[in-house]
UniProtKB/Swiss-Prot annotation:
Role: Involved in regulating the levels of reactive oxidative species and reactive nitrogen species and in mitochondrial homeostasis in the placenta. Required for regulation of inner ear epithelial cell proliferation via the AKT signaling pathway.
Disorder association: Pre-eclampsia/eclampsia 4: A hypertensive disorder of pregnancy characterized by new hypertension (blood pressure 140/90 or greater) presenting after 20 weeks' gestation with clinically relevant proteinuria. It impacts 2 individuals, the mother and her child, both of whom can be severely affected. Preeclampsia is one of the causes of maternal mortality and morbidity worldwide.
Gene Ontology CC: cell cortex; centrosome; cytoplasm; cytosol; fibrillar center; nucleoplasm; nucleus
Protein's UniProt keywords contain Amino-acid biosynthesis: no
Name of the protein: Storkhead-box protein 1
Keywords assigned by UniProt, alphabetized: Activator, Cell cycle, Cell division, Cytoplasm, Cytoskeleton, Disease variant, DNA-binding, Mitosis, Nucleus, Transcription, Transcription regulation
Residue ranges of the region described as Disordered: 327-346, 389-470, 497-556, 631-651, 926-948
One GO MF term attached to the UniProt entry: DNA-binding transcription factor activity
Alphabetical list of InterPro entries matching this protein: Storkhead-box_winged-helix (IPR019391), STOX1/2 (IPR040126)
Biased composition (Polar residues): 390-399, 497-508
Length: 989
């Protein structure tokens, strides 16, 4: 501890008191210490009679003057001793107007010094520096502050920028300083917190009312000292931190005299009671929602008033444009202070940054990340999720096939794109049921797919796709697009059309899709579905939907549940190629040459769909399916026939309606050769419903007979199918016939009045309407025709039983034209794939579900080539349904073979012919699928592809020959498998 320091030596103190008279006289002014000292020395210096006293008085020095009349004098010790002696003897004279009350010695004044530490707090130094700079009207920035520290505080180590930034932030939190766009300022008594709790009603309060707001909580800092804001108009804006966005246009207030500032401070603490004082003193009362700003100057009151008016209402309280607004003494300023951009900390949580400031910081860091961009991004992500969900539904088993997912307006592109996409294995019954219920109305002009609602499978309603889709796809032989994965992979070896786009004319949409499916052999399993036509396109598509599902993979229960998937568990599955092919074909695909073998299934399906009563049909379908799978086992199909016969009567009305609808659709498309009014089906239906009932009964009987005969024929049929399967390897190299050829075949079909291809939505155009009326019409319409055919059939062969069933199993083997399909077909559209085997004339009448199923003539392997050619043509035709009636070749074919068509249109086609046709259609369908690409070495695919026209012509010629042969057989010769086999080679190319 330091030694005590003597502040003053020993002295003599004189305690004086004023005289009464002097008090009265000199009350106005109080004499000072020096004046009293001079008066005291003069009075004693005149004591000439006491030379020692006079000499000592002259040597006195003024030590100090203490209030209450204490005079401290010092002099050499001898002189002080003389004064002591004079006071003892009462000889010491007082100064004028005073009297001496006491005299005494005062000890020397001593002080113990206090040592200082060497630590200098940076915060204090920064505050001092900022205060000095504010006083000097220097803009305080981090750079200028460092310079001042180096210059005026040499004893302090210069802090780094990071330390300086951190220290300043701490001072702001402690409210020792605050930051604005013009720099840092010291928080002084004139700087106060503005309340942020003013209500909406207080926004326009006058300054006199501001006192009410003061007690509220404080949030923001505002300096009322003009000196702290003066001389900064031209100063460059400076931000405290990178995240801070401050106003660049802040105007500083003029410098104020210290007394005025003090007065303002006092008044602000008193509640800001008088508006005049606010204007004069330049107090700034800024609330979060209501700010009253006046600038003060040391000018007269009027000058201050004008200055206050210049602060008009504006969004920025320091905006450059000071527009004068007529106001009274003060002008209200509605804006938040400090602005939202300022990084003001929250009162409660010092670490909390206001939301707006955070937004500004985010903008500084990542300008792209804005609210708008976030909203857009959110919308895009939502769309993406929806689309993803949409696509995921495409692969789900519960979703319908392509056609249902996409609206018709997107028809071609979406369907084609979907054909490439793998579909879910199967559509749930519910979805199929919905699809059936919601089949869109047919629009003759448009072939684009309608966005079809899912059809619940539970309803017996025929599964009919939208007429547009039906038109586009049913006739298009798109059924072939549903080829089994195995069959497709064979074609995959060399697919000349692999790279072709599927965006052809909308009319040939189904056709192109079929090609696509064929062309995309690589896709198997669920991917086969995309190739298939949307279920909305044709009811047989329901069956197709099954086929679309990887048949090997699809559970039989689904098929059975639909009664559409005709898997016979007892029958070992045929090549998946055939199976997929069969299923890929619409049930009446026989008509569409895609589902040659499916017609039987389709008929069964229709039976199930329309009758909805006969549960035996599913088994029949399964058997037929297994039969198809085996390709050689037609036995199961015949066995299943009996059940169909039983249910046929139920299905007949719906079939008739479907036929009627189909005819109407065909008329709209210009596919029918005769006007709708001329349609014998409709006339017959309208004229004679009794005959229709008779037909139904006849069909039932025929179905029964067929079932019996089919049982007999099953063995032979299986053998025949097996042979055909063996031949199928070679036959698989099916020719790819052009659409013209197919169209011709289709034309032939159309020529058949009853043959408004009833392949349910899948195979028959009548299904486009998705109504059973077509069947009814065809039934009624062809009562007479059926009768003629029946008579002819009876004449033709024993096999042709009155019921239309062929008794001999041998006959049924190859022809395998189920009487049911024939008979039903007569009532229903005569789904007569005349293209495939003119001889067989595929009397596939979609109307007769059971008969139709059988109706496809599944010719032997040899016939398969013919079938392929025909199917190719048919498939193409199906793809281009409009071309059926239009192509001259088709017309010519119609001219040449009207009788043949009628013959096959008859509902009572022999079961033998049906079986043959069924087999032929099955083989044909297989070959047709292989047309896109076939592994067979002998496949004429390349030739047929290279010269489709020549192939078509040859096919037509062969068909003509075949028809002639059929006529010959028609005389009375039974169409035995032996007789049919020789005919089939004629069609082979």
């Amino acid at each position: 501890m330091a030694r005590p320091v003597q502040l003053a030596p020993g002295s003599l103190a004189l305690v004086l008191c004023r005289l009464e008279a002097q008090k009265a006289a000199g009350a106005a002014e109080e004499p000072g210490g020096r004046a009293v000292f001079r008066a005291f020395r003069r009075a004693n210096a005149r004591c000439f009679w006491n030379a020692r006293l006079a000499r000592a008085a002259s040597r006195l020095a003024f030590q100090g003057w203490l209030r209450r009349g204490v005079l401290l004098v010092r002099a050499p010790p001898a002189c002080l001793q003389v004064l002591r002696d004079a006071w003892r003897r009462r000889a010491l004279r007082p100064p004028r107007g005073f009297r001496i009350r006491a005299v005494g010695d005062v000890f020397p004044v001593q002080m113990n010094p206090i040592t200082q530490s060497q630590f200098v707090p940076l915060g204090e130094v920064l505050c001092c520096a900022i205060s000095d700079m504010n006083t000097a009207q220097i803009v305080v920035t981090q750079e200028s502050l460092l310079e001042r520290l180096m210059k005026h505080y040499p004893g302090i180590a210069i802090p780094s920028e990071d330390i300086l930034y951190t220290t300043l932030g701490t001072l702001i939190k402690e409210r020792k300083i605050y930051h604005t766009g013009e720099g840092y300022f010291i928080v002084t008594p004139q700087t106060y917190f503005i309340t942020n709790t003013t209500t909406q009603e207080n926004k326009r309060m006058l300054p006199s009312d501001e006192s009410r707001l003061m007690p509220a909580s404080m949030t923001y800092l505002v300096s009322m000292e003009s000196c702290a804001e003066s001389a900064q108009e031209n100063a460059a804006p400076i931000s405290h931190c990178q995240s801070c966005q401050c106003f660049r246009d802040m105007h500083t207030q003029d410098v104020q005299e210290a007394p005025v500032a003090a007065e303002v401070t006092r008044k602000s603490h008193r509640g800001l009671g008088e508006s005049v004082s606010w204007v004069q003193n330049g107090a700034v009362s800024v609330s979060a929602e209501h700010h009253i700003c006046e600038s003060t100057k040391p000018l007269p009151y009027t000058r201050d008033k004008e200055k206050g008016k210049k602060f008009g209402f504006s969004l920025l309280w320091r905006s450059l444009s000071r527009k004068e607004k007529p106001k009274t003494e003060h002008s209200s300023f509605s804006a938040q202070f400090p602005p939202e951009e300022w990084p003001v900390r929250d009162e409660d949580d010092l670490d909390n940054i206001p939301r707006d400031v955070e937004h500004e910081i985010i903008k500084r860091i990542n300008p792209i990340l804005t609210v708008d961009n976030l909203i857009k991004h959110t919308v895009l992500m939502q769309k993406y999720e929806e689309q993803k969900k949409y696509n995921s539904q495409g692969t789900s088993t519960d979703m319908l096939t392509i056609g249902h997912k996409y609206p018709s307006k997107e028809g071609v592109k979406k369907r084609q794109g979907l054909s490439a996409k793998p579909q879910g294995q199967g559509h749930s019954r519910r979805d199929r049921h919905k699809a059936r219920n919601q089949g869109s109305e047919f629009q003759p002009g448009s072939i684009r797919l309608e966005k079809h609602p899912k059809l619940p499978a539970t309803q017996p309603i025929p599964r009919i796709k939208s007429p547009n889709e039906m038109v586009g796809q049913k006739p298009l032989g798109e059924i072939t697009t549903v080829l089994g994965s195995h069959l497709i992979y064979k074609k995959r070896i060399s697919n000349p059309f692999q790279g072709l786009s599927h965006r052809g004319s909308t009319i040939s949409k189904g056709h192109k899709i079929q090609k696509t499916s064929d062309l995309k052999p690589s896709q198997t399993g669920p991917k086969e579905k995309p190739f298939q036509k949307p279920r909305s396109l044709d009811s047989s598509r329901i069956f197709d939907g099954k086929a679309k599902e990887p048949y090997a993979e699809q559970p039989n229960d689904k098929m059975e549940a639909e009664s559409i998937y005709i898997n016979d568990p007892t029958v070992k599955p045929i090549n998946d190629d055939f199976r997929g092919h069969l299923f890929s074909h619409p049930q009446q695909s026989m008509l569409q040459n895609d589902g040659k073998c499916c017609p039987f299934m389709e008929s069964m399906l229709r039976y199930e769909v329309y009758g909805g009563e006969n549960e035996v049909i599913p088994e029949v379908l399964r058997k037929s399916h297994s039969h198809f799978d085996k390709l050689g086992e037609t036995k199961q199909t015949p066995h299943s026939l009996p059940s169909r016969g039983a249910s046929f009567s139920d299905r007949t009305p719906s079939a008739c309606r479907l036929v009627d609808n189909t005819i109407h659709q065909f008329q709209n498309l210009g596919l029918l050769d005769y006007p709708v009014g001329v349609n014998p089906l409709r006339q017959a239906a309208r004229q004679d419903k009794d005959s229709e009932e008779l037909l139904r009964k006849g069909f039932v009987q025929d179905a029964e007979t067929t079932s019996l005969e089919n049982e007999q024929l099953s063995n032979d049929d299986q053998a025949l199918y097996q042979n055909e399967v063996e031949d199928d390897d070679g036959a698989c190299s099916s020719l790819y016939l052009e659409e013209d050829d197919i169209s011709e075949n289709d034309d032939l079909r159309q020529m058949l009045p009853g043959h408004s291809q009833y392949s349910f939505t899948g195979g028959s155009q009548g299904n486009h309407l998705g109504k059973q009326k077509v069947i009814e019409r065809s039934l009624t319409e062809y009562n007479s025709t059926m009768e003629r055919v029946e008579s002819q059939v009876l004449k033709r062969n024993e096999c042709y039983k009155p019921t239309g069933l062929h008794a001999t199993p041998g006959e049924s083997q190859e022809p395998n034209l189920s009487a049911e399909s024939c008979g039903l077909n007569s009532g229903a559209q005569f789904g007569f794939n005349y293209e495939e085997e003119p001889s067989v004339a595929k009397c596939v009448q979609a109307s007769a579900p059971a008969d139709e199923r059988i109706f496809d003539y599944y010719s032997a392997r040899k016939a398969s080539f013919e079938a392929e050619v025909i199917q190719d043509t048919i498939g193409d035709t199906g793809k281009k349904p409009a071309s059926w009636s239009q192509s001259p070749q088709n017309q010519e074919m119609r001219k040449h073979f009207p009788q043949k068509f009628q013959l096959f249109n008859t509902s009572h086609m022999p079961v033998l012919a049906q079986d043959v046709q069924y087999e032929h259609s099955h083989l044909e369908g297989t070959e047709n699928h292989s047309m896109a690409g076939d592994s067979g070495i002998d496949s004429p695919r390349t030739q047929s592809l290279g010269s489709n026209n020549s192939v078509i012509l040859d096919g037509l010629k062969r068909r003509q020959n075949f028809l002639q042969n059929v006529e010959g057989t028609k005389s009375s010769q039974p169409l035995t498998s032996n007789s049919l086999l020789p005919l089939t080679p004629v069609i082979n190319v």
